[in-house]
A protein has these predicted regions:
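Active-site region of the double-stranded beta-helix
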Residues: 33-138, 146-171
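Conserved beta-strand-loop-short alpha-helix elements that form
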Residues: 141
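N-terminal auxiliary "cap/dimerization" subdomain that precedes the catalytic jelly-roll/cupin core
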Residues: 1-56
Length: 171
């Protein structure tokens, strides 16, 4: 389910995120290329690895490794859903390598924070995918096990989205 403009775009873009130079020292960043995840925590090492081969940067377990409003949102969602929730940030540019088509083992509540993201979603196991473009302030609910593939459109050429992954683990 794609819900457009849940949050005001200017307000959403104004929210601080600990990415790039602002990332916490303990925050691990995975650079993904297919099923290859190259993890780094040093800012300079992340920048160097990205320059060598442009890949989507994944800030895993952001709610645990960094402080900010997203940690509070994660705790509130955990309390409401009564399931463990994990917040992860995905940062990419047009042309960055990524996971390719895959499915996830959690219910994803995805919030587009910066730029835009193109999603191909296969609601059925057979048939053509549905194309969805999320823009700043949009929310996409992606059920567990639904096959999808993402890319960053040439315009604006940049994307940051948060995934609040609602797991099967009860709390």
């Amino acid at each position: 389910m794609h819900i457009q403009q849940v949050f005001d775009a200017a307000w959403t873009e104004g929210l601080s995120l600990p990415l790039g130079e602002a990332k916490a020292a303990s925050q691990t960043v995975a650079l993904i290329d297919g099923m290859d995840f190259h993890r780094q925590s040093d800012k300079d090492a992340v920048a160097h690895a990205y320059q060598e081969r442009q890949r989507t940067r994944v800030y895993e377990s952001l709610n645990v490794r960094s402080d900010g409003w997203f940690s509070t949102v994660t705790l509130r969602l955990t309390a409401i859903m009564r399931h463990q929730v994990i917040c992860t940030a995905y940062e990419s540019h047009a042309g960055d390598r990524n996971l390719g088509a895959h499915d996830d083992e959690w219910l994803g509540v995805i919030t587009q924070m910066r730029g835009a993201k193109r999603w191909l979603v296969w609601p059925e196991t057979t048939g053509a995918p549905e194309e969805i473009v999320t823009r700043v302030g949009d929310v996409l609910i992606l059920p567990q096990g639904v096959k999808h593939e993402v890319s960053t459109p040439d315009s604006p050429g940049y994307s940051v989205h948060l995934v609040f992954a609602i797991t099967d683990e009860l709390v």
